Amino acid sequence: MAVPFVEDWDLVQTLGEGAYGEVQLAVNRVTEEAVAVKIVDMKRAVDCPENIKKEICINKMLNHENVVKFYGHRREGNIQYLFLEYCSGGELFDRIEPDIGMPEPDAQRFFHQLMAGVVYLHGIGITHRDIKPENLLLDERDNLKISDFGLATVFRYNNRERLLNKMCGTLPYVAPELLKRREFHAEPVDVWSCGIVLTAMLAGELPWDQPSDSCQEYSDWKEKKTYLNPWKKIDSAPLALLHKILVENPSARITIPDIKKDRWYNKPLKKGAKRPRVTSGGVSESPSGFSKHIQSNLDFSPVNSASSEENVKYSSSQPEPRTGLSLWDTSPSYIDKLVQGISFSQPTCPDHMLLNSQLLGTPGSSQNPWQRLVKRMTRFFTKLDADKSYQCLKETCEKLGYQWKKSCMNQVTISTTDRRNNKLIFKVNLLEMDDKILVDFRLSKGDGLEFKRHFLKIKGKLIDIVSSQKIWLPAT
């Protein structure tokens, strides 16, 4: 059943987790409003309380249609709560088919929106430093939102730019200068990461483990061996743009204003491609009312801890630039006075909150929390009951060599290593819904594309028990 949070609010789904806490979906059972709650245990973040404070401070500065909106925060004892928009469309990586990618018009539209968000961030002097599909979320209209500012920093203040020296991010997405130089400019680093995201969208795979000469795939790229994967899967026009983005020398790397002049960037979408009505900011218009977006990835993933660059001090009480603060108040009653002051006990197993079919309801019902659950393609119905489904899943995962741990009732944690020998952890919930069992996989730690590869492998082994029934999702 749903876990009560505070008066009138229930926690109904774990959206993400990381070193210091998790993100939960909270739904108001009276108004049906949804909000993402990032719950940070400050006792687990004793080594970096300033990082949390800086993340809050940066979030307060943000107001853009391609950036997840921040409503506010409050602290209760050792727990810090950040309230953010909920993105019911899930994470971008879920739309990327491993080794295939996505239709080029979709990739172009998402790339346009990514550029709009990054232009906005750089315009107010902020660099994200961990752009990757796991940190790019989609709303109910499939509009892209940049999320997770745990590694973000201010690189320009009062028109004065400072060089950065902290090596942080996620290795396949980091720019080569992070691995080679003591200091570097902020903007080209984010541009490079956007190029890797575009590659993943078009080819369904990452080009290399890291951009260093010790990596054969990266050396092949520098030698222009585009007859190899992933480049041979990419059409010549977007590949020409990638040749300008993924340039080792940051001073020779294309800038965003020039990206916007690129031939492929301005190529009209193919006939028949899904092209929602857009506003001037590049975002589809959506009905008025409470937006539903989420900040999901909590994985602070430093590549290495270099000497501290953070000479600028941040305080959550320091004044921020005026960025339309009134827009934060997305009432009713300012998100119920930021979810009513908060005082509650954390559930021991928050994912168990989805196990009740009464909670999930049926498609079309007026009060239907299932409509609030994040969309995922990594789920399927089975033809069996819960016990038999669990047993088949367990036997299959053990045969495939996965580490298997029952977390709590109807939830298991599966661990393995991916093709890059990095840790990959995902949670599987068996959910009762309308007398059927939904097997729902969620990435907990690791690379999203690798997670999808493993999901498809497991599903393939279970094909005899997978129901042909389509997963019902909220209409968009």
Curated annotation (Swiss-Prot):
Residue ranges, annotated region (Interaction with CLSPN): 1-265
Modification after translation: Phosphorylated by ATR in a RAD17-dependent manner in response to ultraviolet irradiation and inhibition of DNA replication. Phosphorylated by ATM in response to ionizing irradiation. ATM and ATR can both phosphorylate Ser-317 and Ser-345 and this results in enhanced kinase activity. Phosphorylation at Ser-345 induces a change in the conformation of the protein, activates the kinase activity and is a prerequisite for interaction with FBXO6 and subsequent ubiquitination at Lys-436. Phosphorylation at Ser-345 also increases binding to 14-3-3 proteins and promotes nuclear retention.
Outcome (variant: residue 379 to E): In 3RE mutant. Disrupts the folding and/or conformation, allowing increased accessibility to FBXO6 component of SCF-type E3 ubiquitin ligase complex
Modified-residue entries (Phosphoserine), positions: 280, 286, 296, 301, 317, 331, 345, 467-468
Reported impact of residue 468 to A: No effect on phosphorylation induced by hydroxyurea
SUPFAM superfamilies attached to this UniProt entry: Protein kinase-like (PK-like)
UniProt-annotated binding residues for ATP: 15-23, 38
InterPro entries given in the database record: Chk1_catalytic_dom, Kinase-like_dom_sf, Prot_kinase_dom, Protein_kinase_ATP_BS, Ser/Thr_kinase_AS
Placement of covalent cross-link Glycyl lysine isopeptide (Lys-Gly) (interchain with G-Cter in ubiquitin): 132, 436
Residues covered by the Protein kinase domain: 9-265
CC annotations in GO: centrosome; chromatin; condensed nuclear chromosome; cytoplasm; cytosol; extracellular space; intracellular membrane-bounded organelle; nucleoplasm
GO molecular function: ATP binding; histone H3T11 kinase activity; protein domain specific binding; protein kinase activity; protein serine kinase activity; protein serine/threonine kinase activity
GO biological process, one term: DNA replication
Main location: nucleus
Catalytic-site annotation from UniProt: 130 (proton acceptor)
Pfam families, alphabetized: Pkinase
Region of interest: Autoinhibitory region: 391-476
Record field: catalytic activity: L-seryl-[protein] + ATP = O-phospho-L-seryl-[protein] + ADP + H(+); L-threonyl-[protein] + ATP = O-phospho-L-threonyl-[protein] + ADP + H(+)
Region annotation (Disordered) ranges: 270-327
Effect annotated for changing residue 376 to E: In 3RE mutant. Disrupts the folding and/or conformation, allowing increased accessibility to FBXO6 component of SCF-type E3 ubiquitin ligase complex
Biased composition (Polar residues): 281-320
Function text: Serine/threonine-protein kinase which is required for checkpoint-mediated cell cycle arrest and activation of DNA repair in response to the presence of DNA damage or unreplicated DNA. May also negatively regulate cell cycle progression during unperturbed cell cycles. This regulation is achieved by a number of mechanisms that together help to preserve the integrity of the genome. Recognizes the substrate consensus sequence [R-X-X-S/T]. Binds to and phosphorylates CDC25A, CDC25B and CDC25C.
Disease tied to this protein: Oocyte/zygote/embryo maturation arrest 21: An autosomal dominant, female infertility disorder characterized by zygote development arrest due to failure of pronuclei fusion.
Record-given protein name: Serine/threonine-protein kinase Chk1
Organism: Homo sapiens (Human)
